[in-house]
């Protein structure tokens, strides 16, 4: 196992980025120092707020398919395999990956990993898993390449833009200190690259797996981008706090359309995946796995 890198620049300084208005993908990429957390990125921007309001609404029905609790306690990410089974990342630490039959949720196998508070899983071009850890026992949060049979970490690197998302929050008496956040969902894009949402940075990164560096990034539409899914020429992203799923142009990050769920009756949206044009999602809070039709 090796650390691919500990410091690199992919975006201007973290402090400058925190004060600057979000830019589109075509603008100059800011730079993050991996040794220091990002703080206080103010999103969503007025531009994205207007886009969310104006985006056409795609009406979908939420189907609650199955719930494997208490075995799978906190399903936080989904990934279909080439054989049609479904991988579920449980964020209970240290994280386990469950391979299940998507038709009924029957657990086919379980793999223990070294991930901590994982929030994203995908399969790379060589069949290994890429898992994002939103937290860390020590040091900054990392992204892992994992052996799908043993669960052992093959490689790891510091997640770009890790830190504290949303506005700065002063310490509250009697409350534990705020912990930094790393990557949320991750999805393989082909050609050695994958998309990764990092809420603290206010960005969705297109990453190069071989170098562990960002190729480019999109300004995230919201403060807490969670799940991701790739559908042909479009990228879907979860706006968890809004109970929305956004259809994005992966070249510009523009919101093309949105799906609105009901906060009162529908399970919350965390992990996201798509299969045969149907979006699937999971809720780490209630344990439900759902799809949208």
Residue ranges and their predicted role:
Residues 62-68, 106-111, 152-157, 166-176, ...:
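A short beta-strand motif characteristic of beta-propeller blades
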Residues 101-104, 147-150, 208-212, 249-253, ...:
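Short loop/turn segments that connect beta-strands within beta-propeller blades
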Residues 273-293:
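Blade-level signature of beta-propeller repeat domains, shared across WD40, Kelch, NHL, RCC1
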Residues 1-17:
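N-terminal secretory signal peptides and thylakoid transit peptides that target proteins
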Residues 88-92, 131-139, 196-200, 237-242, ...:
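Conserved beta-strand positions in repeat-built beta-propeller and related beta-rich domains
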Residues 96, 138-142, 246, 288-291:
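Structural motif
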Residues 47-71:
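A short helix->beta-strand "capping" segment at the edge of beta-propeller domains
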Residues 70-82, 114-125, 161-189, 221-232, ...:
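Beta-rich, blade/repeat-based domains predominating
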């Amino acid at each position: 196992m090796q650390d691919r890198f500990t410091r690199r620049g992919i975006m201007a300084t973290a402090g400058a980025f925190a004060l600057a208005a979000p830019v589109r993908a075509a603008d100059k990429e800011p730079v993050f120092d991996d040794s220091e957390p990002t703080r206080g990125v103010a999103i969503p921007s007025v531009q994205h707020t207007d886009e969310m309001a104006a985006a056409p609404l795609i009406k979908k029905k939420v189907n609650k398919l199955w719930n494997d609790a208490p075995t799978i306690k906190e399903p936080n990410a989904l990934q279909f395999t080439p054989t049609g089974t479904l991988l579920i990342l449980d964020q209970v630490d240290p994280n386990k990956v469950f391979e299940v039959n998507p038709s009924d949720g029957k657990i086919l196998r379980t793999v223990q990993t070294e991930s901590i508070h994982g929030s994203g899983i995908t399969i790379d071009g060589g069949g290994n898993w890429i898992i994002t850890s939103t937290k860390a026992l020590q040091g900054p949060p990392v992204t892992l390449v994992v052996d799908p049979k043993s669960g052992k970490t093959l490689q790891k690197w510091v997640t770009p833009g890790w830190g504290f998302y949303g506005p700065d929050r002063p310490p509250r008496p009697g409350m534990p200190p705020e912990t930094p956040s790393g990557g949320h969902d991750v999805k393989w894009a082909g050609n050695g690259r994958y998309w990764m949402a990092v809420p603290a940075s206010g960005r969705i990164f297109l990453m190069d797996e071989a170098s562990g560096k960002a190729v480019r990034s999109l300004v995230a539409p919201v403060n807490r981008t969670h799940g991701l899914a790739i559908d042909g020429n479009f990228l879907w992203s979860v706006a968890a706090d809004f109970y929305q799923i956004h259809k994005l142009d992966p070249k510009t990050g523009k919101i093309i359309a949105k799906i609105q769920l009901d906060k009162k009756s529908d399970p919350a949206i965390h992990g996201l995946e798509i299969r045969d044009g149907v979006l699937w999602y999971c809720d780490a809070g209630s344990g439900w796995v759902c799809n949208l039709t």
